Amino acid sequence: EEIEKELAALANVQPGAMAPDIRKEDVNGDTVSISALKGKVVLVDFWASWCVPCRKSFPHVKALYEKYHKKGFEVFCVGDNDSTPDKWKEAIKQDGVEKFYHVLRGLRSYKDENGRHQFDRSQDVSDRYAIHYLPTKYLIDREGKIVGKFNDEELDAKLKEMFGE
């Protein structure tokens, strides 16, 4: 069953596939979604406040945002901080990325009847994007289709191409 879920998630994020929608409450309590950004080029950035490489990539993502936002570029961040939302909010402010969309991934932890730590993944959007490490960045085109998963250099080149520079 786990393998089937993983294969389905990998199929969801193949280039050309419609991006799985993420519709959640954002850092300000408003409901936001990827589908509402159709018509824009969207970078979906999976990160966490405790992830040093994630935080180090924000200045680069901010520079891309400044360069392309007026041309229709948005950044939709998914934080892996469900158990520490205060640290998530603090990191957003510290790193100066309030202009981006921010939601939590939706992984809920709890203790079962035997006192063992368990996870409820039913609302976990990271599973829909086959996320296994952070940071992971997916680019979505104006039609809402997956362009691909990119590192910083690849992302620069792809955005130049997409915005005709």
Q: Predicted segments — roles?
A:
Residues K56-E98, S109-D124:
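Structural microenvironment flanking redox-active thiols in thiol-disulfide oxidoreductases
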Residues K38-G39, D45-A63, K67:
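Conserved redox-active cysteine motifs that mediate thiol-disulfide chemistry
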Residues E1-E25, S35-K40, D86, E90-K93, ...:
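N-proximal helix/coil linker or "cap" segments that precede and/or mark the start of modular domains
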Residues V32-A36, V125:
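Short conserved loop adjoining the S-adenosyl-L-methionine
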Residues D45, V75-G79, L104:
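Short beta-strand segments
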